[in-house]
């Protein structure tokens, strides 16, 4: 299975920043890549909040896969925050 080299928290924070800044996401900047690079860290707490909410899968998610694996994966990200 392919994995990302960018941590999940950073990827989520970048999406949140892009949604605010990018014309594609509802912002006003048609070329927001540099601004996202400069501001994604402002969204890290929101990214952790999203992951915290997702730590328990919903019924459809649980039916599609292994709940213990899901909890372990999300938990690994959240534990890094505590250890930071």
Task: State what each model feature region is.
Residues 2-35, 49-70, 81-84:
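Amphipathic alpha-helical oligomerization segments
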Residues 12, 42-45:
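Beta-rich globular "head" domains
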